[in-house]
């Protein structure tokens, strides 16, 4: 009996030891996993998102030659721009939606682990602004693009160029250290500024391909003269500028590359003029008071994102499409996201022709005539915007079909989905309502309109300072 009892006790002890060891191993594994998760979140809360973006950009942009300008003849433009149009826009929209979802999941993980999150729900800003060392990794911005212009890499693959001189004395032989000297170079460049400056351009600033103008950390104004021309080139990022009081200039010789200068006829006085170009991203700029448009994209331009900008005090804000008869603009795809259309605006936010336009999560607080207009059968997909109508009871309608009979425009695909309409604002839809009809005008997942105030709260040029989250 004693021997049996001793055996039973031994078996019980062995079982208890095994259970204890198992529990200890499980607990250690759980702690290790938790620590690993926290470490990964601290190191890069958006690592999965960034990797996916880089993979997407690399795959889609392999065919572009990073050292060659776009064609400089209209005859060659259709072939060039066709490559900028998504082969399967529905797939693109799904991919971008997945990236946004991953960003949301990363923020949720941070909150569960008790870490501070500076996320706003704006996927562009949440991609880079939380990093207090943003100035040490400026080129990360190029991996944060969304929408149809998301593949614009600007000067990501080139060296930095520091603008030290705000003058523009010689537009044919620009001085090294000036903005004009930087933007005409053939090589990719990431252009930054040594200090705050006001640049008064004598003639339009004609950019070359693969350039980023990055004014973060400095208060940079392009004002009281000519402004920016993006003509027959590709891959440009313009970020952080104050552009205002642009004037018509021209009838002068102007250099456009180290090896070429030529006669320029009169320019209209746009803040940013995009002409026959692709893969363009205009982000976090403050634009106002110009002679013609604030952002105009014409003559076969496509693959454009206009995001996080603050537009004020202007009549004809944004023109997308050259003319009703210029059918090459049928390939145009433009994303207009997270912008604030603010005080003193009248019309064209935007005014569209022919192509496909995704207007998403913008804040429209002021217009005098209308917000969104068009002609020549554009497809307009308005999602998650906030439209606050003016007090004028004759200007409550968000939309305007320009010089077109109702019998014709009723066939155009214009829809409002999830928009917040305030103070009597109303959006007049037309054409198809099914999502399938808007595949080529869909470029990212819209947030609820209730988030627009937060998403657009810092639209315009940012007051970034080194060593602090921007």
UniProtKB/Swiss-Prot annotation:
Residues binding Ca(2+), per UniProt: 268, 292, 296
GO MF term set: metal ion binding; pectate lyase activity
Cofactor detail note: Binds 1 Ca(2+) ion. Required for its activity.
GO biological process: pectin catabolic process
Requisite cofactors: Ca(2+)
EC nos: 4.2.2.2
The keyword Signal appears for this protein: yes
Cysteine disulfide links: none
Tissue and organ expression note: Expressed in flowers, but not in leaves.
Pfam families tied to this protein: Pectate_lyase_4
Annotated signal peptide: 1-22
Record: glycosylation sites: 46, 65, 106
Active-site residues, Swiss-Prot/TrEMBL: 348
Pathway where it operates: Glycan metabolism; pectin degradation; 2-dehydro-3-deoxy-D-gluconate from pectin: step 2/5
Recorded catalytic activity of this chain's protein: Eliminative cleavage of (1->4)-alpha-D-galacturonan to give oligosaccharides with 4-deoxy-alpha-D-galact-4-enuronosyl groups at their non-reducing ends
Keyword annotations: Calcium, Glycoprotein, Lyase, Metal-binding, Signal
UniProt cross-references to PANTHER family, sorted A to Z: PECTATE LYASE 15-RELATED, PECTATE LYASE 18-RELATED
Protein family according to the UniProt entry: Belongs to the polysaccharide lyase 1 family.
Entry protein name: Probable pectate lyase 15
Annotated source species: Arabidopsis thaliana (Mouse-ear cress)
Organism lineage string: Eukaryota, Viridiplantae, Streptophyta, Embryophyta, Tracheophyta
